[in-house]
């Protein structure tokens, strides 16, 4: 049985989005919890990403991945990690600009977002170092190169 159930929502009509099987593998690899969980991964366009980024982060531009951890009411235990909102056009554009394989960049965004759902952050330097080291290790286990080598922009969620 899988540790992570992925609810994949497609709100993007374009091409280049990886398969649900890949999203499941990446989310599973990044899940550090002992118990099974569920995550919603919503693939969106620039408009929806910009709107959510503006509403929740005060930034009026689309972004690669937004993470929304599930916060259960007191006394209620539900196996939900939360939601990831990934902007397909931004991920594809970043991959081109950074000369990265698009699938590798998609995997990085899922791993990055899943770690955010588990409380990891990159605001403080020491937290960023811990999170990035874990991302590098998890992506290597999935067969991908270090995403931070020669990177021009960082994940912005």
UniProtKB/Swiss-Prot annotation:
Binding site for Zn(2+): 112, 116, 122
Required cofactor names: Zn(2+)
One of the protein's GO biological processes: rRNA processing
Primary localization class, coarse: cytoplasm
Subcellular compartments: Cytoplasm
InterPro entries the UniProt entry points to: MetalPrtase_cat_dom_sf_prd, YbeY, YbeY_CS
Disulfide bonding pattern of the chain: none
Record's GO cellular component terms: cytoplasm
Keyword annotations from UniProtKB, A to Z: Cytoplasm, Endonuclease, Hydrolase, Metal-binding, Nuclease, Ribosome biogenesis, rRNA processing, Zinc
Keyword Methyltransferase included in the entry's annotation: no
EC number: 3.1.-.-
Cofactor comment: Binds 1 zinc ion.
Gene Ontology molecular-function annotations: metalloendopeptidase activity; RNA endonuclease activity; zinc ion binding
Family membership: Belongs to the endoribonuclease YbeY family.
Function of the protein: Single strand-specific metallo-endoribonuclease involved in late-stage 70S ribosome quality control and in maturation of the 3' terminus of the 16S rRNA.
Name of the molecule in the record: Endoribonuclease YbeY
Organism field: Marinobacter nauticus (strain ATCC 700491 / DSM 11845 / VT8) (Marinobacter aquaeolei)
